[in-house]
Amino acid sequence: MRILGIETSCDETGVAVIDAERGLLSHALYSQVALHAEYGGVVPELASRDHIRKLLPLVRQALDGADTAASDLTGIAYTSGPGLLGALLVGAGVARSLAWAWGLPAVGVHHMEGHLLAPLLGDEPPEFPFLALLVSGGHTMLVDVQGVGRYRILGESLDDAAGEAFDKTAKLLGLSYPGGPALAALAERGDPARFSFPRPMTDRPGLDFSFSGLKTRALTTLRETRTEQDRADVARAFEEAVVDTLVIKCLRAVQETGAERLVVAGGVGANRRLRQRLKEAVGAEGASVHYPPFEFCTDNGAMIALAGLMRFQAGAGEDLTIRARARWNLESKSEV
């Protein structure tokens, strides 16, 4: 079984080919970071237009890289949601058109399902069941994963996602887009003892998150600061607060569920300090921590191809309807 995967949920155009026996054969990725940088964030209309320009050339690149013809494919998987509706429609429309032209089945994949399965692309993939921390620009949630399509959300952000809070705070600090990596780099020079930010919702039961208050705290603190070192100290305090909050909630979830494996996926999962702290804290509970390869932490076609492959293997299939959902609850992604 060989699957073509297409990802266009936001500002990355990703295409990949995966084979059930040989694994990932190729992946091609185009990032729109440079396009959106001058606006300080993603402009949905520009994102959709750029997907239109780049998607078919990337499909050809991925097929050529995998030495694969259309006749070699078993099916096509595409991101059906959640995400920017216009961007999703580009990927869904192309995927359905190719499937119809080539006589192949197609299946829509939940974007966050792709992320939580991405660690299976690594050299040491975790076994089901596992606990997943999905932490990105659009989502922050803890999920009990029993198998493909068997997901139970244990907690999620009630306002800003962690990645969104990183980007917004980076903008307050005058850093370039995307802000998360830039803020982490600035925080390396910061004094961890200078400022102390709260760890939201860690003083009460439950596994939900809230990060909007940290952004406000950063703004208030910045009004009283002037120097480059001040900015670095604020960045460090912010990063420490976000990382501590994520670690505390993950540790609580491991203890409450008895999970032996924690999967961390999404762009914020590439944060070095978060990885270090989780390894120490979760490891002390006797659980292992698993990540996707670094290149698959952010949005990509490989994770969509893998999720599609696993759903096709389980007998999934859809009609010819082009489905795109700006919002889509992960728990509603039915078991296959």
Swiss-Prot record:
Documented EC number(s): 2.3.1.234
Cofactor binding note: Binds 1 Fe(2+) ion per subunit.
One GO CC term on file: cytoplasm
Primary site of residence: cytoplasm
Highest taxon of the lineage: Bacteria
CDD domains: ASKHA_NBD_TsaD_bac (cd24133)
Protein keywords: Acyltransferase, Cytoplasm, Iron, Metal-binding, Transferase, tRNA processing
NCBIfam families: gcp_kae1, T6A_TsaD_YgjD
Full protein name: tRNA N6-adenosine threonylcarbamoyltransferase
Taxonomic source organism: Thioalkalivibrio sulfidiphilus (strain HL-EbGR7)
Gene assigned in the entry: tsaD
